[in-house]
Amino acid sequence: MVVAAVLSFTGCYNDFDDPAPAKVWTEADFNKDQIITIKQLKDIYYAKYAPGSTAGLGKYVEITEDYVIRGKVISSDQAGNVYKSLYIYDETSQSGIELKLMVSNYVYYHMGQTIYVKTKGMALGNYRYMISLGMPPTEADIEKNYANRNLENQLLINEHICPGAMGELTENDVLVITPSNYETALNDDALGRLVRFEGLTYKEGTSGNNFYPSYVEAIYENGKTEATYTSKSYISEGLTPTYAYSYNNQRYYGSAWFSYGGTTTEDKGNYIVRVSGYSNFALQPLPEAGATGDITAIYTKYSSSSGGFITYQLLVNSFNDINF
């Protein structure tokens, strides 16, 4: 009860027992020296662990200063593909970041809306090269190589997340990549940003030990709490290639390969669209091999736990963002 009372005065939401029009937060609610850019926040992490360094994998840095970041919402979990995450973008520093929240974020945070985040007590974590902002990890999280954890209850969300004014995404909020500029205009500074990839080619085939398109079957054997994962080819299983697997109440992630050229998924200009079996477009058919089109997605990076086998992945908000 004491905690709840404190948070009712210091948090970002109204008192549920005394409802009133929702507060719309603005810069005027914070001291000028509190507000920093998303890039400046990330640089706190990079001051300890250099960008791209394997030394930072699975590590976190707790924020001890009373910093506030702001950004526009650039993600939506309404289609079921984004899970327990909210991505925001700061036009000032042209940087984006993932906030580790809970589910149904689209109900509370709308695309284009400004969000303020009180970061003190939160943790910047590095999972497979992607920097996110959440709460400090538990020992159990660290054992699983998770560098931070979700704001898993409303009290934490109320304390740290401050909804601002509604708005719209503009052309300035989306980085445009084409076959002629991908080699120079796109780098790891854009991780966590909303990017429109124009003129991509859909590919089928093998890269290393992986075949595309494919899905990852997760089987829990003999009551085990950890799954055994097996990558399977739609074609070999006699299935129509779709963005993900969703049959007989079994839902698995699917992976599809899109490219600007090259022969492997590790070549620059090659991207994996990874889609949840819980998304509402899981069973949409993939394009014909060689087809070209555009994809708008959150730009992300993924690797093995040791930092090898790096791929760049595209996190799609909605099937409407895939135009083939």
Language-model-detected regions and their locations in the chain:
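Sec-dependent signal peptide recognition
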Residues: 1-2
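C-terminal motif of bacterial Sec signal peptides marking the signal peptidase cleavage site
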Residues: 7-11
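OB-fold nucleic-acid-binding modules
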Residues: 13-83, 87-324
